[in-house]
């Protein structure tokens, strides 16, 4: 009896104690707070966020926004939003994502910085559009945001923020231009970005990786380190297989070009720094390549440019030092065409179509003032390998066409641009042209042909206005000089000094301008040689024609200059197919007002002159040779040539 009473008393005591604990107002208040916090976090906050996003977009941004699902874990400090869409009022898309996950860390209290363990955006899509009025849709969106009355100070440090891991997965970027007569749209997808330890804390750097696919199969890769305070980034950037047709779509109304073929590769190590409002950018070991390039004028079949490759290797660019160094440039295997129309306009000048601006308030371009520090440009070696040329000049009275089967060039170049007149030097110039033919436009029969034309050791100094060439050699080839029945020589008419094409006119104008400025161009060619040339001479004013065929023609000229005083040394020799040979050597002044020469004929056949002898005499010339050697001196005086 005593034991049962004692047990009941103990049980009642425990119950009373539990009741006191459970009914403690502080405990009840804590439980109520946790329940309320849970309800606010799990239920009310998602509902508020969904309504706020929708209302804010409609009232402030004048657009449409919606989120299908929002989940908040108030204990883990995570937010998970799915299927967000932001559209313009007419339902055109601006931004969307499949999922946004945020994981906020309480360690922010210890870092004194907002800390996110994870920011993850899945399947985001950004639509950037240039509208019909020329404005960017994002600019209109930015204008819709409420403006702060107090402009922030540019010197104020950014909010303290630390993101331990951020990732964009399977994103897409769509760019559209509706301002041109021919609208264009391209989408870059998939786009993947990853950042680690990204922070606005001073001198805090974190690694990043960016990968994206380009339209048509190209790729973009970008990795390195980044800091947001101060702004700094260093790493590797690469673009592979970028199709030129992608860029052409957005510029086709400004270009008189059909859709181009070709792709671009680019890679570089870079370092970017922004301190005290001054940007620093250095590119090292940069490589650039254009492959299978094909440019064709709209409405034309023949391409203006067709190249297997343009390669630039080991470039160095320094924005602060204002210098660009290119150790190696290679252009190889292809063809370049150019044509001048009747008005003297080069077809390459017509590739850019200028549209008249209808904006009366458009600013008037102001001439830029030279900066104190010029840009320094330098190329170590430029190599052009096996490139054919086609040039047609219809600005002449008789249009001419020049065809070169193969062009090879080696040169070095340097330049200073800005801070005064342009200074540029080309040296170490070597040039070789193969299979050269000059003909009337539209006529495939060459007027003059050369197997090769080679230039050795040339230099061009634009600052000093000087052109110097050590030697020019031409080999083989030939021409025909025909006097027709009317006594006209077509070749002489075609190459008449009075028939000036575009290039010759521009050279003459450049020379006149330089002389007017008191700093004329100087030119010097130490030696010119022609070997193995052939000339067919024919006079059709006689019946039968008088014909001479010259072969193995050798011409040597030395000291060709425009200094106005140095005489030109010449030496020429040839053989005659009909029999005999001849040579002429001596000196002639630059303007031809005096000359001294030695002429030598050995066994020159005069039998081809039979038609002339028959026409003017009653004699018949059956055979004969002439051999002679003489000196000739010529000069002009007031009374005439002597």
Task: Show the residue positions of the predicted features.
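N-terminal type II signal-anchor transmembrane helix
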Residues: 2-61, 234, 244, 343, ...
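A short, amphipathic edge element
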Residues: 61-68
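Flexible beta-edge/linker motif
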Residues: 71-135, 139, 152-174, 235, ...
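Surface-exposed loop/turn segments flanking beta-strands in extracellular/periplasmic regions
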Residues: 139-147, 349-359, 492-502
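Elongated, acidic membrane-bridging lipid-handling scaffolds
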Residues: 145-254, 259-263, 274, 331-333, ...
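Short, solvent-exposed beta-strand/turn "edge" segments of beta-rich domains on protein surfaces
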Residues: 256-260, 278, 618-622
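Acidic/polar low-complexity surface segments
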Residues: 345-346, 488-489
């Amino acid at each position: 009896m005593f034991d049962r009473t004692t047990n009941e008393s103990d049980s009642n005591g425990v119950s009373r104690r539990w009741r006191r604990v459970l009914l403690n107002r502080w405990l009840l208040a804590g439980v109520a707070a946790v329940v309320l916090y849970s309800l606010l976090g799990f239920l009310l906050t998602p509902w508020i966020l969904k309504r706020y996003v929708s209302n804010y977009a409609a009232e402030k941004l004048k657009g449409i926004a919606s989120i299908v699902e929002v989940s908040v874990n108030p204990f883990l400090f995570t937010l998970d939003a799915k299927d967000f869409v932001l559209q313009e009022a007419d339902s055109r898309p601006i931004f969307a994502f499949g999922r946004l996950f945020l994981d906020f860390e309480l360690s922010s209290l210890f870092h004194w910085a907002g800390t996110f363990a994870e920011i993850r955006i899945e399947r985001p899509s950004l639509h950037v559009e240039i509208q019909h009025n020329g404005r960017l849709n994002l600019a209109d969106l930015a204008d819709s945001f409420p403006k702060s009355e107090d402009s922030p100070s540019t010197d104020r440090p950014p909010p303290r923020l630390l993101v331990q891991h951020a990732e964009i997965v399977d994103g897409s970027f769509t760019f559209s231009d509706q301002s041109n007569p021919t609208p264009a749209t391209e989408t870059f997808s998939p786009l993947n970005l990853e950042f680690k330890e990204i922070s606005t804390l001073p001198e805090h750097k974190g690694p990043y990786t960016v990968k994206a696919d380009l339209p048509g199969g190209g790729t973009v890769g970008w990795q390195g380190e980044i800091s947001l305070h101060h702004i700094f980034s260093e790493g590797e950037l690469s673009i592979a297989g970028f199709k030129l047709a992608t860029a052409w779509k957005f510029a086709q109304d400004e270009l008189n070009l059909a859709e181009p073929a070709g792709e671009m590769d680019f890679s570089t190590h870079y370092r970017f720094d922004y301190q005290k409002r001054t940007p620093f950018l250095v590119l090292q070991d940069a490589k650039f390549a254009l492959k299978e390039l094909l440019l064709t004028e709209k409405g034309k079949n023949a391409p203006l440019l067709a190249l297997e490759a343009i390669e630039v290797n080991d470039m160095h660019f320094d924005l602060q030092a204002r210098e660009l160094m290119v150790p190696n440039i290679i252009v190889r295997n292809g063809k370049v065409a150019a044509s001048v129309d009747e008005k003297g306009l080069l077809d390459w000048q017509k590739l850019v179509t200028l549209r008249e601006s209808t904006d009366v308030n458009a600013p008037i371009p102001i001439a830029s003032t030279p900066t104190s520090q010029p840009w320094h440009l330098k190329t170590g070696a430029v190599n052009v390998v096996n490139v054919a040329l086609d040039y047609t000049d219809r600005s002449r009275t008789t249009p001419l066409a020049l065809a070169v089967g193969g062009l090879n060039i080696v040169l070095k170049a340097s330049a200073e641009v800005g801070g005064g007149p342009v200074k540029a030097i080309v040296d170490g110039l070597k040039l070789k042209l193969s299979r050269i033919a000059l003909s009337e436009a539209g006529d495939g029969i060459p007027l003059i042909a050369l197997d090769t034309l080679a230039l050795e050791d040339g230099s061009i100094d634009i600052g000093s206005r000087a052109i110097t060439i050590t030697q020019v050699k031409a080999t083989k080839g030939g021409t025909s000089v025909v006097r027709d029945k009317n006594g006209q020589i077509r070749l002489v008419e075609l190459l008449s000094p009075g028939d000036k094409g575009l290039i010759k006119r521009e050279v003459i104008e450049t020379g006149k301008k330089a002389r007017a400025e008191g700093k004329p161009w100087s030119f010097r060619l130490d030696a010119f040689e022609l070997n193995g040339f052939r000339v067919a001479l024919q006079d059709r004013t006689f019946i039968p024609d008088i014909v001479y065929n010259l072969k193995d023609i050798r011409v040597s000229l030395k000291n060709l200059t425009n200094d106005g005083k140095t005489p030109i040394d010449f030496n020429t020799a040839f053989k005659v197919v009909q029999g005999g040979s001849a040579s002429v050597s001596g000196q002639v002044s630059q303007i031809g007002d005096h000359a001294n020469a030695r002429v030598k004929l050995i066994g020159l056949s005069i039998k081809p002159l039979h038609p002339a002898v028959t026409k003017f005499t009653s004699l018949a010339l059956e055979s004969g040779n002439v051999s002679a050697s003489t000196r000739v001196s010529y000069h002009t005086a007031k009374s005439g040539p002597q």
